[in-house]
Amino acid sequence: MPNFTNFEALINVGKSYSIPQFMKAVIPVAGAGTKLRPLTYTQPKALIPIAGKTILSHIVDQLKDAGITEFIFIVGYLGAKIQDYVKQTYPDLTTHFVYQNERQGTGHAVELTKQLIGDEPIFVALGDTICEFDVKEIIDSPISMIGVHKVDDPRSFGVATIDDNGFIEQLVEKPSIPKSNLALVGLYKINETAVLFECLKQLFVENITTRGEYNLTDALACMLQKGTT
């Protein structure tokens, strides 16, 4: 199900950078939504209506209202429906569609956008994440941030441990024995994208996977280890 959670903590994961004039949003929506069947037999999960509009519109509207005008959608299952919906609903936005033909994880999905992003800062919002938070404040911040939320059982999530100053010390994807109950909610503002793509490449070269997938969490953990964040 979609994640209905507040942006409980904004965890600083980066050095201070000048605020970008423009920022691209990356929204992975390639999943088949098997947990929501039969609803997703004929439509992608992102187009399921919640509280009067689709999950995808909740996400796009929030980012658009904060000033983001360029979106990269990573599509796969029933991707043509998402592409048609976005073009009809948001004709004034600059949109790109990248196909993830084999769902190999969030890290693999983001890596597919490299040519469109280059080394520009990005805001990544997983396509089933609905949250209430001040997007503009996060975009305008000169630091990279990750959204987290306390949960009772974080073993099915990426998990963050933080220091006394609110900086991330460690990130682990779906740990069997979590060191904290701070789960990643699927919202990421990343300034150091050149390092991000370097770490994603490292995942593929070294075949670093969690439960058979290349995860964005593991790439962010790599960034921490490199000392760039």
Language-model segments: residues:
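Short N-terminal binding/cap micro-motifs at the start of the first secondary-structure element
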Residues: 33-38, 155
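Conserved donor-nucleotide/metal-binding helix-loop-beta segment in metal-dependent transferases, i.e.
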Residues: 133-155
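Conserved N-terminal catalytic core of the sugar/cofactor nucleotidyltransferase
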Residues: 7-27, 35, 49, 53-126, ...
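Catalytic-core segments of class I nucleotidyltransferases/pyrophosphorylases
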Residues: 167-229
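A structural signal for short hydrophobic beta-strand segments in well-ordered beta-sheet cores
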Residues: 47, 160-162
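Conserved beta-strand segments of alpha/beta enzyme cores
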Residues: 46, 94-96, 167, 229
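Active-site glycine-centered loops adjacent to acidic/histidine catalytic or metal-binding residues
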Residues: 31, 128, 150
